[in-house]
Amino acid sequence: MDNVANLFLRAKHWQIFVLLVGVGFVGDVVVIVSSISATARSPEDFGKIGLPFGFVMALLMFFFLGWFWSMGSFLSSIVQPSLRLKMGFFRFALVYPGLYIFVFMALFQSSTTNPALLAVIFPLHFFAMFCMFYDLYFVSKSLVLAEISKPVSFYDYAGPFFLMWFFPIGVWFTQPRINRLYAERKTPELSIAARPG
């Protein structure tokens, strides 16, 4: 695991909440202030707020997907190999929404001049939504698999799935479980390393 993943895995629930909600809140304030000042200057300048909005969305997506990548990679590494979900599509499903946000912003700016581009946006957008739901599925199922070490049904991991879907509430319940599993994983490694050789 690299340092970024360890940072997310060790972070307390309130730290993840403050990071993601704080970035969103500060970004929204910046966008609102810039849109008010742009409207006051001229209507043409109002269209330029797409850049700060896109930057805020990309930053928020980066942190959110980084948190999911950290959880998914860690949980997959501690699940029994026979129960482990395949990482290939999970990795793709993390990268695609992050890249899509830039494509969306570029096409959204262009859609005012060419409405036909909206036909391109919809399938790309729905696939990005599918990828986000797959990320929720992967992390929630891997969390329960890591905790109980036996095959699970949707009923078993529906709680974490919906809690992570409704992020502002779910982070308070999900992150402590991640912290516990991470601490359990690190404690045996530390005791083995501390043994005289």
Predicted regions and their residues:
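Low-complexity, intrinsically disordered extramembrane tails and loops of integral membrane proteins
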Residues: 1-11, 40-44, 180-197
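Membrane-interface helix-boundary motifs at transmembrane edges
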Residues: 8, 40-47, 76-88, 112-115, ...
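Alpha-helical transmembrane segments
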Residues: 13-27
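Membrane-helix interface segments in multi-pass membrane proteins
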Residues: 24-63, 99-131, 196
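Hydrophobic, aromatic-rich membrane-embedded alpha-helical segments
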Residues: 25, 60-62, 156-179
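Membrane-water interface of transmembrane alpha-helices
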Residues: 62-77, 135-141, 174-175
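Alpha-helical transmembrane segments with an aromatic anchor "belt"
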Residues: 68-101
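Feature detects long, helix-prone N-terminal segments enriched in hydrophobes
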Residues: 95, 100-104, 117-161, 174, ...
